[in-house]
Amino acid sequence: MAYIFDTNVFIRSKHEMPMDLWPTFWKKVAGMINSGDVFSSIQVKGEIDKGGDELTDWMKDNAPVGFYVENEPDVMVKYGEVMNWAQSNTVYRPEAISEFAQVADAYLVATAAAKGYALVTNEIADPTCKRRVKIPDACNALGVRYCGLNDVLRELRITI
């Protein structure tokens, strides 16, 4: 199984496992990326690049061509399905749907659905949340598997 990583997985890892203190962890992440087990969305690249920090530099050094999945036609078809689901869900406020459409989240769900990836995120499902569309809720609606980083490490039998 291949995995697609949410921006928050990289950012939270940067904060909780700084590169200077956890070099083995970051080498293992680079190994997962280079083995073709892990991908991300081109929208995630944009979000990480905005940071302009050591994570931005690390990603430039470790993300090979093809790591960031482009918004190909199959992804855009699924993106339409994701957005139709969000817009038809009466729980969400209009600003929540607008934000969901503009950040990487909807594209991540669409890419996972189109490519058969499991989506890796730190978010937790909350189908009653009005102010934000949560990735796990969108995954559940589209039948996409989601999990956390530790699940991926276990499934790929990676230890630090």
Residue spans for each PLM region:
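Short, well-structured N-terminal submotif of metal-dependent ribonuclease cores
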Residues: 1-61
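Residue-level detector of structured alpha->beta connecting loops
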Residues: 37, 113-116, 143
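Active-site neighborhoods of divalent-metal-dependent phosphate/nucleic-acid chemistry enzymes
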Residues: 74-136
